[in-house]
From Swiss-Prot:
UniProt superkingdom: Bacteria
Alphabetized GO MF terms: 2-C-methyl-D-erythritol 4-phosphate cytidylyltransferase activity
Protein family: Belongs to the IspD/TarI cytidylyltransferase family. IspD subfamily.
Gene transcribed to yield this protein: ispD
Protein name, UniProt field: 2-C-methyl-D-erythritol 4-phosphate cytidylyltransferase
One example of a Gene Ontology biological process annotation: isopentenyl diphosphate biosynthetic process, methylerythritol 4-phosphate pathway
Lineage of origin: Bacteria, Pseudomonadati, Pseudomonadota, Gammaproteobacteria, Alteromonadales
Originating species: Shewanella halifaxensis (strain HAW-EB4)
Gene3D superfamilies: Spore Coat Polysaccharide Biosynthesis Protein SpsA, Chain A
Residues at the site labelled Positions MEP for the nucleophilic attack: R156, K212
Catalysed reactions listed for this entry: 2-C-methyl-D-erythritol 4-phosphate + CTP + H(+) = 4-CDP-2-C-methyl-D-erythritol + diphosphate
Length: 230
């Protein structure tokens, strides 16, 4: 029997400053093919027919978001984000319907496709606890010691690169994020909060070009992917 969420929302934590880019402005506002990285991300989410609402968590000192062309879209809402990603996600979850499901997506992943969103949403029937997009590890993985010397080769079997969106019921994600943070757990993404609570999220294989723009070289790569998008 298929499950149909009461509502599907997207949450975009966009309160960070992206210091590793070495740019003068937060990386989500850097230009990419004639509009900002965040604009590309929002365009994909706002245009998806199954997403009812897109909630963006912003830095309280943000002076850039109001200039985006998407700012007046009827499906868009904004909240004040926090210092950490998890705090921003919680801010978005707090204004969501209790029976909704949340797609949490990185602001700096502008190459997301509707096809991957469709696959993730459909996975609720196989993974009623929630799931994430991920890409299988293809390269040989090495672990180093504290001196930067290779100490071992890590078996890549069943290893995945975690991507976003990550898709969970609003009520359980909010509870587990809250509890994990209160316990001082290291939470790097939504799945890690669910794992901490004993939930085993599913994996949905996603496109490897759904990259996160983190370093300057990533901008050129994202530009190429967007130009060749099908």
């Amino acid at each position: 029997m298929s499950q149909t969420p009461e509502q599907i929302i997207a949450i975009v934590p966009a309160a960070g400053i992206g210091s590793r880019m070495g740019a003068e402005i937060p990386k989500q506002y850097l230009q990419l093919n004639e509009q900002s990285i965040l604009s590309h991300t929002l365009d994909c989410l706002l245009s998806h027919p199954d997403i009812d609402k897109v909630i963006v968590a912003l830095n309280p000192a943000d002076n850039y978001f109001a200039k985006l062309p998407q700012v007046k879209h009827p499906k868009l809402e904004c909240v004040i984000g926090g210092k950490e990603r998890a705090d921003s996600v919680l801010s978005g979850l707090k204004i969501a319907e209790a029976g909704a499901w949340a797609l949490v997506h990185d602001a700096a992943r502008p190459c997301l496709t509707h096809r991957d969103i469709d696959k993730l949403i459909a996975s609720v029937n196989e993974f009623p606890q929630g799931a994430i997009l991920a890409a299988p590890v293809r390269d040989t993985m090495k672990r180093t010691d504290e001196k930067g010397l290779i100490s071992e080769t890590v078996c890549r079997e069943r290893l995945w690169h975690a991507l976003t969106p990550q898709y969970f019921p609003v009520s359980s994600l909010m509870q587990n994020l809250t509890d994990a943070l209160a316990a001082g757990a290291l939470i790097t993404d939504e799945a890690s909060a669910m794992e901490w609570a004993g939930v085993m999220p599913g994996i949905v294989s996603g496109r490897a070009d759904n990259i996160k723009v983190t370093h300057p070289d990533d901008l050129q790569l994202a530009s190429l992917f967007l130009k060749n998008a099908v």
